[in-house]
Amino acid sequence: SPGLKELMLLSLLTANHARELALLRGLPDPEEANLCGMFRNLGEVLVAAYFPRDYARILQVMEQRACGQAAAAFEVLGFPYEELGEAMARNWGMPDRVVAGIRSAGTQASDDLLAITAFAHELTTAVYRRDADPARDGVAEVLQRFAKRLKLGRDEVGGVLQSALKE
């Protein structure tokens, strides 16, 4: 499947970023953050693994229409990746907080774990995705959205990125 190996690596990086952020913020269970990060893009991974033609079409739509991943996935599949990820995580008996982390509310999340998961996912996307716009400072954009919510600065984010790569 196009990009499956990359998606698995992105899952690991998101998990590592989430755990590092949880440690930095003193959350009681950093491994729960790791698990939430690991499953954040479960729906996309499943589509790439089990429906490679559809996944290739999503990537094609993104390129042809210069649209975002969510819009392209919805156009091709008729539902967002997160719906599939949530359904499978529930089916597998994953904890409710892990399921909630798959479609977290980002900066609006009332739960620190969910905000950290959303930030970790967006950070990973901004830094490592091939389809990220190289002309934009994606890290600055993500940090601007989440800095107040998570009380983070650019230096702390740099430390999170370095620690996660060591892992």
Q: For each predicted feature, which ranges?
A:
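Metal-dependent nucleotide-binding catalytic modules
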Residues: S1-M8, L12, N16-R19, L23-E32, ...
